[in-house]
Amino acid sequence: MSDVTIVKEDWVQKRGEYIKNWRPRYFLLKTDGSFIGYKEKPQDVDLPYPLNNFSVAKCQLMKTERPKPNTFIIRCLQWTTVIERTFHVDTPEEREEWTEAIQAVADRLQRQEEERMNCSPTSQIDNIGEEEMDASTTHHKRKTMNDFDYLKLLGKGTFGKVILVREKASGKYYAMKILKKEVIIAKDEVAHTLTESRVLKNTRHPFLTSLKYSFQTKDRLCFVMEYVNGGELFFHLSRERVFSEDRTRFYGAEIVSALDYLHSGKIVYRDLKLENLMLDKDGHIKITDFGLCKEGITDAATMKTFCGTPEYLAPEVLEDNDYGRAVDWWGLGVVMYEMMCGRLPFYNQDHEKLFELILMEDIKFPRTLSSDAKSLLSGLLIKDPNKRLGGGPDDPKEIMRHSFFSGVNWQDVYDKKLVPPFKPQVTSETDTRYFDEEFTAQTITITPPEKDDDDGMDCMDNERRPHFPQFSYSASGRE
């Protein structure tokens, strides 16, 4: 966009997302909300296609004196995952200048969006959809914590937890993501979670987990998401050791289709790994969004703290260069390599050595791999995101055109017309044979956050929830 201008630019210290040390970065804040950091001050204002997807729109700003004085944090909810970036500058005045500039850009973008919503010819359609959704939650009693049995902790992190639940009324299984409200709303600030939950409601794709309900309690936001029962892809691969190239092509195509959809909505998934891929009862891929930033794990040898699964991290993430959509194509390369080769492309128990491999080591292939498969994986696992297959402006189209996928009809992929190469042996959506036996037989308890909640974690009156009016959603009205 030619009318995008730089609002503020300067050096700041940015804390690494995975290796928690501080690095100097030259940041540009632009009128479109982009906030991009470079290792060196860029000479050319018209920089090449920016890979960064981080925007200050709909974000929450916090100031803190820890772990260093004059620190500020930008936090936002992307899909249902909390993304957080931490910066520090030398003086309180500098911090004030940055936070005021960021807030001004965010406020202006918010106003523009509201104006667009009011003037847009589609706003009436949007409103009808919202009314339908409200109606669905009115006619079907609003969901509360009491409507579910809690079976197993699927994940736990800094901002909340994900629990496998069974809806009492239907017997269906879901993953419930529970986020603490205080991490999303600043004390004096209304969060933008509602807008984000609206994005979630509209995120519908055959290979992405869909949102079934969302509701709130006194101090938590709850997202109830689809949980398919064909088993984790990791489980099936570990049983068979490797998948054929045909089977890998089928799964790879479905993943590309889903990532294409997310990228078109300006969402970078960031967390593609085997553990986040499941199969539905028919054998199609479902990419889960149960991710939470894991508690930091400290590597004793270096005393640096890591966040996440280091084996899957792209080079640009490790180096803490700003990254964007190409990070997902690296993730695709890693999972497809695992499927066809039966191991990770880079692995070492020592994190420092692992990082060196990811950044420097050339990829090696088994002799059994076809030249098309080698070519695809080599392209996806290029260290430089700008040169990576899928890293250019064409994004997924580069991958779709690759010879490994020749003969694939991408519309048929989306329409689920391709026959899955493996069908899980489940008889229905509530068949639990691929679940761990230890947790299908028993339920777990959730500690009530407040003693005065009627049912432990029930919904509260709207008047007592000024920040989150109407944070309630049921997909049943749309199916």
Curated annotation (Swiss-Prot):
CDD domains per the UniProt record, alphabetical: PH_PKB, STKc_PKB_gamma
Positions with biased composition (Acidic residues): 451-460
Domain of life: Eukaryota
Gene Ontology BP term (one): intracellular signal transduction
Compartmental location: Nucleus; Cytoplasm; Membrane
Sites carrying sugar chains: 302, 309, 472
Organism: Rattus norvegicus (Rat)
Domain AGC-kinase C-terminal: 406-479
PTM annotation (Phosphothreonine): residues: 305, 447
UniProt name for this protein: RAC-gamma serine/threonine-protein kinase
GO cellular component: cytosol; membrane; nucleoplasm
Gene that this sequence comes from: Akt3
GO molecular function terms noted in the UniProt entry: ATP binding; protein kinase C binding; protein serine kinase activity; protein serine/threonine kinase activity
Modified residues (N-acetylserine): 2
SMART domains recorded: PH, S_TK_X, S_TKc
Activity-regulation annotation: Two specific sites, one in the kinase domain (Thr-305) and the other in the C-terminal regulatory region (Ser-472), need to be phosphorylated for its full activation. IGF-1 leads to the activation of AKT3, which may play a role in regulating cell survival.
Enzyme category, top tier: transferase
Function according to Swiss-Prot or TrEMBL: AKT3 is one of 3 closely related serine/threonine-protein kinases (AKT1, AKT2 and AKT3) called the AKT kinase, and which regulate many processes including metabolism, proliferation, cell survival, growth and angiogenesis. This is mediated through serine and/or threonine phosphorylation of a range of downstream substrates. Over 100 substrate candidates have been reported so far, but for most of them, no isoform specificity has been reported. AKT3 is the least studied AKT isoform. It plays an important role in brain development and is crucial for the viability of malignant glioma cells.
EC number, as in UniProt: 2.7.11.1
Similarity comment: Belongs to the protein kinase superfamily. AGC Ser/Thr protein kinase family. RAC subfamily.
Sequence intervals crossing the membrane: none
Subcellular location, principal: nucleus
